[in-house]
A protein has these predicted regions:
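Active-site loop signature of alpha/beta-hydrolase-fold enzymes
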Residues: 13-15, 57, 132, 151
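Substrate-recognition element of Asp-dependent hydrolases with the DxDx(T/V) motif
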Residues: 34, 38-71, 84-97, 136
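Generic enzyme active-site microenvironment
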Residues: 7-9, 51, 126, 168
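Short acidic, glycine/proline-rich loop/turn micro-motifs
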Residues: 18-22, 60-61, 156-158
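A short alpha-helix capping/helix-coil boundary motif
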Residues: 14-18, 53-55, 87-90, 110-113
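Asp-based, Mg2+/Mn2+-dependent phosphohydrolase catalytic module
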Residues: 2, 64-86, 94-125, 129-183
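Active-site neighborhood of HAD-like aspartate-dependent phosphohydrolases
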Residues: 1-49
Length: 183
């Protein structure tokens, strides 16, 4: 039986990000400790889902089949570490599309709420960017910032806004703390 849902961003939280986008399986590299963090959450009985902006599709830098291959590599790496990612949702649109699925809009998170039949109140939504945090707030979840990826810059920007959120060095540190808090 699940102990609850944890939602993760992908680039900058699970894997290293690139200003040029992750366009192939060869460019996908996990951040140290991220797969172990996923495994820790899985072993503790949490469902794990990923919500990620992937405008590289809209920019024609990669196609859906390539994105699916990248996700298969990520899923296999998580499984090998002892973790399980149950669902991945993504927004393929350009930032100018005006869709409701591109973070900071809450559409992807609300989709996961429907998929798992759970309200997002109290659900940790882990990201490394201001838009991840804004989406978490808009969806009514519990925003969590990690300092990997764009996290350090985002922490400074969020501090200027006076938004108080939990901040961790990386996904592994969050997972350890969260599992210990929920025992």
């Amino acid at each position: 039986m699940s102990r609850g849902l944890v939602i993760l961003d992908r680039d900058g939280v699970i894997n290293y990000d690139s200003e040029y986008f992750i366009k192939s399986t060869n460019e996908w590299h996990p951040i140290d400790g991220s797969l172990e963090g996923i495994a820790r959450l899985s072993r503790a009985g949490f469902d794990i889902a990923v919500a990620t902006n992937q405008s590289g599709i809209g920019r024609k830098l990669l196609d859906v089949a390539t994105l699916e291959s990248i996700h298969q590599k990520m899923l296999a790496a998580a499984r090998k570490a002892g973790g399980d990612i149950g669902k991945i949702v993504y927004c393929p649109h350009l930032p100018t599309a005006g869709c409701d699925c591109r973070k900071p809009q809450p559409g992807l998170l609300l989709q996961l709420s429907r998929n798992y039949s759970v309200p997002l109140t109290g659900v940790p939504i882990v990201g490394d960017s201001v838009r991840d945090i804004d989406a978490a707030v808009a969806a009514g979840g519990r925003p969590i910032l990690v300092r990997t990826g764009n996290g350090t810059q985002s922490e400074a920007a969020l501090a200027k806004r006076g938004l108080e959120i939990d901040v961790y060095d990386d996904l592994a540190q969050f997972a350890e703390a969260f599992v210990n808090q929920t025992r």
